[in-house]
A protein has these predicted regions:
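Short capping/connector residues at structural and topological boundaries
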Residues: 29, 47, 156-157, 171, ...
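Hydrophobic positions within alpha-helical membrane elements
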Residues: 9, 77, 106, 192-194
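Short, solvent-exposed loop/turn and secondary-structure capping segments
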Residues: 12-18, 109-111, 194-197
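Substrate-binding/active-site clefts of carbohydrate-active enzymes
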Residues: 1-64, 82-93, 97
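Active-site-proximal beta-strand/loop segments in catalytic clefts of secreted hydrolases
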Residues: 5-6, 74, 101-103, 186-188
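Loop/helix patches that line or flank the sugar-binding groove of alpha-linked glycan CAZymes
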Residues: 178-197
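Active-site-proximal helices and loops of the catalytic beta/alpha 8
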Residues: 65, 73-176, 181
Length: 197
């Protein structure tokens, strides 16, 4: 089984702020926790926050013998922490699969640039894969044009772009291995594949 892990949707910022104020989240320069639509942005570059991520992944593999993880909003996390979690879990399961939503959503701490675990990271890793929104948008449409006609619903699309996506060469990011790219059309987000009227 592949588990869906959602480290970035904590609903309330207080969940971690009550443990240790101004630590577990990425912060603005004034000490305000950075948030997104799902709550606080978990500060995975902070030592104990990274440990929370890595240790919980290891625990799930060791205790429940899971085969892998799908990271919701993986692009919110730094690449080094996700890579460390993968390597730690792989010692327990050498066939571990790790993939995620590699959208370019990383906020980090203000004025502290760090490599995000997003689609742009795919040229640097062969251990973790990301979803290709390019193939989804061309075949059925998606954010930000959800519901607009696409290839399978009669919309005009460039067939060469679709073919490039089928061989793991999306047009919106570069990958150096086909295993870096998860081609998909529909998942738990957004509209269904197709609704008949």
């Amino acid at each position: 089984a592949i588990l869906d892990v959602v480290y970035n949707h904590t609903a309330k910022v207080d969940i971690f702020e009550d443990l240790e104020p101004n630590y577990y989240h990425f912060m603005d320069a004034d000490g305000t926790p950075r948030t997104s639509f799902g709550g606080g942005r978990l500060g995975t570059t902070h030592h104990m926050t990274k440990r929370l991520l890595v240790d919980s992944i290891k625990y799930l593999v060791d205790t429940y013998k899971v085969d892998g993880f799908r990271f919701d909003m993986m692009g919110d996390h730094d690449a080094a922490s996700v890579e460390e979690a993968y390597k730690a879990a792989r010692t327990l399961n050498p066939n571990l699969i790790m993939l995620g939503e590699g959208w370019r959503t990383y906020a980090g701490d203000e004025n502290m640039p760090t490599k995000a675990a997003d689609q742009d990271w795919m040229k640097k890793t062969d251990t973790v894969a990301v979803f290709s929104d390019d193939i989804r948008n061309n075949l059925k449409s998606g954010y930000p044009n959800e519901g607009q006609p696409a290839f399978i619903t009669g919309g005009k699309r460039d067939i060469n772009t679709i073919f490039k996506n089928l061989i793991a060469q999306p047009t919106n990011f570069e990958a150096d291995s086909p295993g870096d790219v998860i081609q998909y059309i529909a998942a738990h987000d957004n509209l269904t594949l197709f609704d008949r009227s």
